[in-house]
Amino acid sequence: LKHEDTNLASSTILRPGMNKELLGILVSYKVKVNLMVSYGGILGGLPASDVGVELPLILIHPKPPHGERAVATSSEDIVVEEFTQQNSQTQS
């Protein structure tokens, strides 16, 4: 797996017949929003009431399209270049 696209976790098990092109990492969250709503303003009116809503939020990291693979790097692929910093001092 070192030189392959390791976009999925190593613990992922594929079921037979499952489409491998549609796999990705799926994370889902719920955002809960509580609001206090009142009617009538200062002069009276109806009592306040609470309103709660849960909003589903799904984050997905899909497999990159064919041709946009991440390239594995090894120590032989890394090129180190050294640059020297030139100090420019102006005299007044």
Swiss-Prot record:
Recorded family membership: Belongs to the arrestin family.
Subunit and interaction comment: Homodimer; disulfide-linked in response to retinal illumination. Interacts with CXCR4; the interaction is dependent on the C-terminal phosphorylation of CXCR4 and modulates the calcium ion mobilization activity of CXCR4. Interacts with GPR84.
Transmembrane segments: none
Cellular component annotations (GO), alphabetically ordered: photoreceptor inner segment; photoreceptor outer segment; synapse
Function: May play a role in an as yet undefined retina-specific signal transduction. Could bind to photoactivated-phosphorylated red/green opsins.
InterPro entries: Arrestin, Arrestin-like_C, Ig_E-set
This protein's encoding gene: Arr3
Keyword Ion transport: no
SUPFAM superfamilies: E set domains
Name of protein: Arrestin-C
BP GO terms, sorted: endocytosis; negative regulation of signal transduction; signal transduction; visual perception
